[in-house]
């Protein structure tokens, strides 16, 4: 199932401490988050391994979830242990061998001033089957992308290190613009005109067998898959420059480009703005790191056992 296929509307979702049927997991139309985008979320994958279903880097995702709530003074009234057990149980109840997991916290229904006031913080966890985000073929052949006319907001405007629901309007605009023009995904630039990231992915550039990825000061989300790729690359002897500025023009002259993300995993980029990148397909460095990533998450290696939470 790709990102653009319909989800099956059945199963169980955890909401505010209760397990409810999928069709009953609803919110009030006057919820604060519905009007002002005041929610935070995570996207996490669980993989079907020989040792059972395993959530990848759950603890790091939980860290970011709670940290994302802080700029919005959002109090999450459930402990890490409660959210972990809720997530494991949702996966069990939905009988999922592999899954995409979506923890969500948002200001709910009470009042509709811009200030959330006494609005409650509602919390939910859903999980469903979700295959390659941009399609299985994209993992092998790469995707066509377009640099968007929409710019990424700066951290001086809205906290870019928080995974905030409302901020993804920017991502939606960029992605849909690219798809209208025949591309499969977008790249957004920051306010200085340097490369930031994809709508839901971090980006890596390969040049002379070295890796470059925009630093946190470039208005990017501190991606957990980004960190995974950096670790895997350094373990394989690659030099990684993870705090750089990348110009738009550098994209076109790269040896290789690829996206990373919990949904996108490791997806090669074969073309930017109708300009072929490298050999026009998945480059050798990208292929090596992609293979290492999938070997890791599917537990075909014993490396980094600490990154897995078993259902």
Name the predicted role of every residue range.
Residues 83-98, 104-110, 128:
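Short, acidic/charged, Gly/Pro-enriched secondary-structure junctions
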């Amino acid at each position: 199932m790709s990102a653009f296929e319909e989800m099956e509307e059945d199963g169980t979702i955890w909401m505010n401490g209760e397990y409810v049927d999928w069709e009953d997991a609803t919110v009030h139309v006057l919820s604060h988050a519905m009007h002002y985008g005041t929610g935070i979320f995570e996207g996490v994958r669980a993989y079907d391994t020989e040792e059972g279903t395993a959530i990848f880097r759950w603890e790091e995702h939980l860290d970011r979830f709670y940290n994302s709530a802080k700029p919005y003074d959002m109090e999450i009234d459930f402990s890490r242990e409660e959210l972990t057990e809720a997530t494991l149980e949702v996966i069990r109840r939905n009988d999922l061998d592999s899954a995409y997991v979506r923890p969500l916290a948002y200001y709910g229904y009470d009042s509709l001033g811009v200030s959330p006031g006494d609005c409650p913080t509602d919390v939910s966890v859903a999980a469903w089957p979700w295959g390659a985000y941009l399609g299985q073929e994209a993992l092998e052949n790469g995707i066509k992308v377009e640099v968007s006319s929409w710019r990424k907001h700066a951290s001086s405007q809205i906290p870019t290190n928080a995974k905030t629901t409302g901020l993804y309007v920017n991502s939606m605009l960029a992605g849909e613009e690219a798809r209208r023009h025949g591309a499969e995904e977008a790249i957004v630039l920051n306010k200085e005109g340097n490369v930031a990231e994809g709508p839901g992915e971090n980006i890596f550039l390969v040049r002379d067998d070295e890796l470059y990825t925009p630093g946190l000061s470039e208005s990017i989300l501190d991606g957990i898959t980004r960190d995974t790729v950096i670790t895997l690359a350094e373990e394989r002897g690659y030099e990684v420059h993870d705090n750089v500025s990348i110009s738009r023009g550098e994209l076109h002259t790269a040896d290789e480009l690829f996206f990373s993300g919990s949904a996108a995993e490791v997806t090669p980029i074969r073309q930017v703005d109708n300009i072929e990148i490298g050999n026009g397909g998945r480059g050798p460095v990208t292929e090596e790191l992609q293979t290492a990533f999938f070997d890791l998450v599917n537990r075909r290696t014993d490396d980094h056992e600490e990154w897995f939470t078993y259902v």
